[in-house]
Amino acid sequence: MRGCLTVLVLALLAALLGAWVGAPIVARDAVAVALRTSGFTAKSLSIRVSANPPPLLLLGHADRVHIVAGGAAVRGLQADSLDFTLSDVDLASRTFGSVDGTLVGARIAQPAGTTFSAGKVDVAGPTDAALATLQLDAADLRAMLQSAYGDAGRTAPAAVEPVPPSELAVTVAGKREVGRLAIDGGSLVMRVGDLVLRLASPGPDLPLELRTVSVGSGGVVVGGVVDVAALLP
């Protein structure tokens, strides 16, 4: 009888150890499958799933899912690198409570089939209404302005200079023009006299709404709200 009890105890310990060690691996693979079925692609991908205690993962709950990807793309968004942590994750229903992360080298699709770039995008907050902070550097702004001026049938600016708190100065055909940035209908625009230039408009496939804009000496910061749950359904 004592021998049988010993065998049972050892079997139970082995099962617990297997669940402790194996649960994160099983959960990681499940997250990878969920990402692929949502349309997410990446040239490199690392996923770490954690729960305390780890066997909770076998019940479909994860405290955190940490995703690091290079060359990432999903729907109307591409990024050179992505580093996201999802919290309070239900693996079965593929839902999560909040997100905190960063995109570097982001390219965002627009309705006309073009893209605009943001050197860095920070995302933090609840799943369906996370705050997105887009940081636009000089290269991002030049590309936006050249495209917008071209669409308006005007000569592309040769230089751009931030003028805090809300303006950009551009040099066009040797002349200096100053435009005021604003958000109009979810798009980033610049008003130069009577001319309204549309600089950035997230496309319909990307659940991102631009809401605020500010100009600093180092560039432009655009604030918005993104539905990450809709981005990674």
Q: Each predicted region: which residue ranges?
A:
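Hydrophobic membrane-targeting and insertion signals
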Residues: M1-L59, G71-G76, L231-P233
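Beta-strand secondary-structure signal
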Residues: S46, R64-V68, D83, A169, ...
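Extracytoplasmic/luminal low-complexity segments enriched in Pro/Gly and acidic/polar residues
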Residues: V189-P233
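N-terminal beta-strand/beta-hairpin edge segment
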Residues: F40-L141
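Soluble extracytoplasmic domains of inner/organellar membrane proteins
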Residues: T115-V189, G193-V196
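Short secondary-structure junctions
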Residues: T37-S44, Y149-R154, G203-L208
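Solvent-exposed coil/turn segments that connect beta secondary-structure elements
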Residues: N52, G70-A72, S87-V89, A139, ...
